[in-house]
């Protein structure tokens, strides 16, 4: 038995690796734009939970004897939910909006084992630094934030521009170890059952 990560996120994989788990990586093929459109008007937490669930549900049938984890993160700032910026220009625009402000990073988790499905979200408050225009442009030029929810990373270059967080650091990086641990316990497993030791 193993953990299957329904994600191509290197950050989610690194979180599990640093916690002693070498997951099988099986990225989910989900039309996120269509799903987001269908969820229009839903609460932010529900949106990220449903995105995570869709990813896990696509992958789970291929691994009936394994624990499948789907995840998704989005940044809630000024009552607007933001995903990945994808472009340099969008990254710069977002950083000019979020610098010096507080936002909430919401990470949805879906953990599936057989017929059992556990869906939960985790929210962490982020206090962004007053980053300079030059640093914002250079950060965007690095390419690092283009495919990250909220246009930032906590564990790499983006860490320079985060003053503080309130909540679970692993959730900000992309996968809450406390949420996954609680789900494993509910499924009758120990976290250590999946350690590669």
UniProtKB/Swiss-Prot annotation:
It comes from the Bacteria. SUPFAM superfamilies: ITPase-like. InterPro entries: ITPase-like_fam, Maf-like. Its main location: cytoplasm. GO terms for biological process: nucleotide metabolic process. The keyword Cytoplasm applies. Its EC number is 3.6.1.9. It catalyses: a ribonucleoside 5'-triphosphate + H2O = a ribonucleoside 5'-phosphate + diphosphate + H(+); a 2'-deoxyribonucleoside 5'-triphosphate + H2O = a 2'-deoxyribonucleoside 5'-phosphate + diphosphate + H(+). Its cofactor is a divalent metal cation. The keyword Hydrolase applies. Keywords: Cytoplasm, Hydrolase, Nucleotide metabolism. It is found in: Cytoplasm. It is an enzyme of class 3 (hydrolase). GO terms for cellular component: cytoplasm. The active site is at residue 72. One of its GO terms (molecular function) is nucleoside triphosphate diphosphatase activity. Belongs to the Maf family. Nucleoside triphosphate pyrophosphatase. May have a dual role in cell division arrest and in preventing the incorporation of modified nucleotides into cellular nucleic acids. PANTHER family: BIFUNCTIONAL DTTP/UTP PYROPHOSPHATASE/METHYLTRANSFERASE PROTEIN-RELATED, BIFUNCTIONAL DTTP_UTP PYROPHOSPHATASE_METHYLTRANSFERASE PROTEIN-RELATED. This is Nucleoside triphosphate pyrophosphatase.
